[in-house]
């Protein structure tokens, strides 16, 4: 899988309603690709999808909190794991299939792209890769 940054034009389109999110997204993308240089990415209409080759993480403007509770700017990170995360940082969690949990985490600053978050990203990467 190629290690390429998401196309600026496609990102501008994705984040057109909240362009202040782009630096936050770029910081997350950089950390993720530094940790997993073999990860692929696709900029889609509503999200950026990270693959290995299965999807293990997404970045989007999904409203995982009430609008009044969202930071400005914000980015929602979605991770697929084999268990439910027990953390106040998780805004929403669901089990769409037995043994597969989808977690949505809203971040509002680069400081929130920390060791804890990137440990969960790594766990999601390994979970998707080893399926």
Language-model segments: residues:
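Alpha-helical interaction segments
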Residues: 15, 40-41, 91, 110, ...
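Well-ordered alpha/beta subsegment
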Residues: 96-131
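Conserved short hydrophobic patches within well-ordered secondary structure
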Residues: 1, 77-79, 121
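Short, conserved beta-strand/beta-arch hydrophobic-aromatic motifs that form part
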Residues: 42-102
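Charge-rich, low-complexity N-terminal segments
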Residues: 1-31, 36-43, 47
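Amphipathic alpha-helical interface surfaces
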Residues: 24, 28, 55, 117-120
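Residue-level marker of positions within ordered structural domains that often coincide
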Residues: 37, 82, 129
């Amino acid at each position: 899988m190629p290690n390429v940054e998401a196309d600026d034009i496609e990102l501008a389109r994705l984040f057109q309603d909240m362009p202040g999110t782009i630096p936050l997204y770029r910081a997350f993308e950089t950390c993720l690709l530094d940790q997993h240089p073999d990860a692929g990415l696709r900029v889609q209409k509503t999200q950026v999808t990270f693959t290995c080759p299965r999807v293990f993480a997404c970045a989007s403007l999904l409203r995982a909190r009430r609008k009044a509770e969202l930071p400005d700017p914000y980015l929602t990170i979605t991770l697929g794991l084999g268990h439910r995360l027990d953390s106040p940082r998780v805004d929403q969690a669901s089990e769409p299939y037995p043994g597969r949990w989808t977690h949505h985490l809203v971040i509002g600053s680069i400081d929130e792209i920390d060791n804890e978050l990137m440990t969960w990203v790594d766990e999601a990467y390994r979970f998707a890769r080893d399926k």
